[in-house]
Swiss-Prot record:
Descriptive protein name: Acetolactate synthase large subunit
PROSITE patterns: TPP_ENZYMES
Protein residues bound to Mg(2+): 463, 490
Entry keywords, A to Z: Amino-acid biosynthesis, Branched-chain amino acid biosynthesis, FAD, Flavoprotein, Magnesium, Metal-binding, Thiamine pyrophosphate, Transferase
Single GO term (MF): flavin adenine dinucleotide binding
Binding site for thiamine diphosphate: 71
Pathway of action: Amino-acid biosynthesis; L-isoleucine biosynthesis; L-isoleucine from 2-oxobutanoate: step 1/4; Amino-acid biosynthesis; L-valine biosynthesis; L-valine from pyruvate: step 1/4
InterPro entries: Acetolactate_synth_lsu, AHAS_TPP, DHS-like_NAD/FAD-binding_dom, THDP-binding, Thiamin_PyroP_enz_cen_dom, Thiamin_PyroP_enz_TPP-bd_dom, TPP-bd_CS, TPP_enz
Organism the protein comes from: Parasynechococcus marenigrum (strain WH8102)
Pfam families linked to this entry: TPP_enzyme_C (PF02775), TPP_enzyme_M (PF00205), TPP_enzyme_N (PF02776)
Record-stated family: Belongs to the TPP enzyme family.
Length: 617
């Protein structure tokens, strides 16, 4: 069988026999062998041979290409596809500006440990280094933000490179990889020998070892001894599908559980053991708990600054158990007393298995009672229903009306309110946490909807961040993706304004978005997307419910109170106990309070640290 061009059928090749085909056809066959069923991308000159082969692959029915309106959106969609499914996301882009447009999305995936294979076109091999039209060194540009990258110099290497790329992207700590393919490599005919997934091991590559029983047992010993333990769960628990083992461990030892922004969904936030999210905009009770715990059990979390606040005051009385797959994270920000290195799913399953061989005697009753006191005293507050709609009301309405939806978010105040008030299952919360990429939400919703066509997908956005990738309304319309985009519209860059109010003496430099803001509903309709504007509290539930039930893509523009701030908040440089925006309790009798000897502040008797200055009480 001799294939003479990329436009010849690429599917159905013999599993092992060499075939004479083009590099582009070989690439598509390699992707098929790795189970790729969806590709997000945007064509251009250097990648046209690959798109020619993709056209044939689509006609065979094994893959679907989603044409985005901007390459950055393609990376975010592939990212969310991976987060929603646990599979590797795939996106295409051409050389030059097409490739550089991918960079923000690659960095977003890298910061959040998302497996993704990014394939770029490149100028022909003889033109590399000549400043040819649309030539950029995307290999060099992306080196700091990928796990590995390749420039394909010989089409015969394509099968092996694709196999390595998928292995590296998905193994260990997941992350993005990049394959840069010169145009003439895609065109060249050669004897293609198919390479099966997992059959090529890159040099120096090592699969994570199973967890050591000694480390697991040592961690279990500390849990059994602790009186004030706290499970601190990050995104690694979701990547490892460890939520069932996590739940069993928490229930068996009655461990309270807090999650990071990336860890939302790893543990049921409706469970009495949940204390919600911790950190800068976490719940007061999560931040008090981490400050007073005597054992911190970190699961797939990296002790980042938005979680820890002032690092040397983070969990100051606690011993630390760290479950982690990436050895570079052990001891990076916080020394671990016991480190359990390995796949989190295997590690937690093994811990549950060993625990069942012991008698579980939880010692946390008094600790849970204290946490419940904090929950009662410092709940997430909802302002009184008067005047303009409050942002929190919008999120509570979404929670009531779409409790099982996959939620994606943009970045800003709306993201934090969503994290505080929504309750999501595993892989049901998709947000840019590490890089904080504005414009992530709508493309991510596209990717999640393509991945999960039978699930409801809701994007929570701000009026500033939605404009970063507003053109993707065209993608929603073109493919009929029934995503619901809820804009929490306060006509500000809300988080920037809040910081300017709090820390820059109310100098609102370049954060007011009132002038020049589009009519979002008219804009959506111009793309062929339905839209509804909500400004009246009395109509919020009715109109939101109708929009969420629509079978078509819909934009919902909810105008909210302009000056509302997101609280609680840990100010920069402060400890987690030094939150601002907590509800006051003037009714407290002196007999139930403590006075801080450092700053004189009066606080509840059950506190061990002063919420004003962070001093030990």
């Amino acid at each position: 069988m001799t294939l003479t061009s990329a436009s010849t059928v690429v599917g159905g090749l013999d599993a092992n026999a060499p075939q004479t085909i083009s590099g582009a056809a070989a690439l598509m066959d390699a992707l098929r062998r790795h189970g790729v069923d969806t590709i997000f991308g945007y064509p251009g000159g250097a990648i046209l041979p690959i798109y020619d082969a993709l056209h044939i692959a689509e006609s065979e029915g094994w893959v679907k290409h989603i044409l985005v309106r901007h390459e950055q959106a393609g990376t975010h969609a592939a990212d969310a596809y991976a987060r929603a499914t646990g599979k590797v996301g795939v996106c295409f882009g051409t050389s030059g500006p097409g490739a550089t447009n991918l960079v923000t999305g690659i960095a977003t995936a890298q910061m959040d440990s998302v497996p993704m294979v990014v394939i770029t076109g490149q100028v022909p091999r003889p033109a590399i280094g000549t400043d040819a039209f649309q030539e950029t060194d995307i290999f060099g540009i992306t080196l700091p933000i990928v796990k590995h990258s390749w420039v394909v110099r010989d089409p015969a290497d394509l099968g092996s490179i694709v196999a390595q790329a998928f292995l590296i992207a998905a193994s260990g700590r997941p992350g993005p990889v990049l394959i840069d393919i010169p145009k003439d490599v895609g065109q060249e005919q050669f004897n293609y020998v198919p390479v099966e997934p997992g059959s090529v091991i890159p040099g120096g590559f090592h699969q994570p070892e199973p967890p050591l029983d000694a480390a697991v047992a040592a961690a279990l010993d500390l849990i059994e001894q602790a009186q004030r333990p706290l499970l601190y769960v990050g995104g690694g628990a979701i990547s490892a599908c460890a939520h069932d083992s996590l739940r069993m461990l928490a229930e068996r030892y009655q461990l309270p559980v807090t999650t990071t922004l990336m860890g939302k969904g790893a543990f049921d936030e409706n469970d009495a053991l949940s204390v919600g999210m911790l950190g800068m905009h976490g719940t007061a009770y999560a931040n008090f708990a981490v400050t007073e715990c005597d054992l911190l059990i970190a699961v797939g979390a990296r002790f980042d600054d938005r979680v820890t606040g002032k690092l040397d005051t983070f969990a100051p009385r606690a011993r630390v158990v760290h479950f982690e797959i990436d050895p570079a994270e052990i001891g990076k920000n916080r020394k671990a007393d016991v480190a359990v290195l390995g796949d989190l799913g295997l590690s937690l399953a093994r811990m549950v298995e060993i625990s069942l061989q012991r008698t579980a005697e939880p010692r946390t009753a008094a600790w849970l009672e204290r946490i419940n006191t904090w929950k009662d005293r410092y709940p997430l507050t909802i302002p009184p229903a008067e005047g303009a709609i409050y942002p929190q009301e919008v999120l509570l309405a979404v929670r009531d009306l779409a409790p099982d939806a996959i939620v994606t978010t943009d970045v800003g105040q709306h993201q934090m309110w969503a994290a505080q008030h929504l309750r999501n299952g595993p892989r049901g919360w998709i947000s840019s946490a590490g890089l904080g990429t504005m414009g992530f939400g709508m493309p991510a919703a596209m990717g999640a909807q393509v991945a999960m066509p039978d699930r409801q997908v809701v994007c929570i956005a701000g009026d500033a961040s939605i404009l970063m990738n507003i053109q993707e309304l065209g993608t929603l319309a073109a493919y009929g993706l029934p995503v619901k985009v809820v804009i929490v519209n306060n006509h500000w860059q809300g988080m920037v304004r809040q910081w300017q109010e709090s820390f820059y003496d109310e100098r609102y430099s370049a954060s007011d978005m009132l002038n020049g803001m589009p009519d979002f509903i008219a804009l959506a309709r111009s793309f062929g997307v339905d839209g509804v504007k909500i400004t009246d509290r009395e109509l919020l539930h009715r109109d939101l419910a109708a929009a969420l039930q629509s079978p078509t893509p819909t934009m919902i523009d909810v105008h909210v109170r302009r000056g509302e701030n997101c609280y609680p908040m840990v100010p920069p440089g402060k400890s987690n106990a030094q939150m601002v925006g907590l509800p006051s309790h003037p009714e407290l009798a002196m007999g139930t309070t403590r006075t801080c000897s450092s700053c004189g502040a009066i606080t509840a008797h059950e506190h061990r640290f002063c919420p004003q200055c962070g001093a030990s009480l």
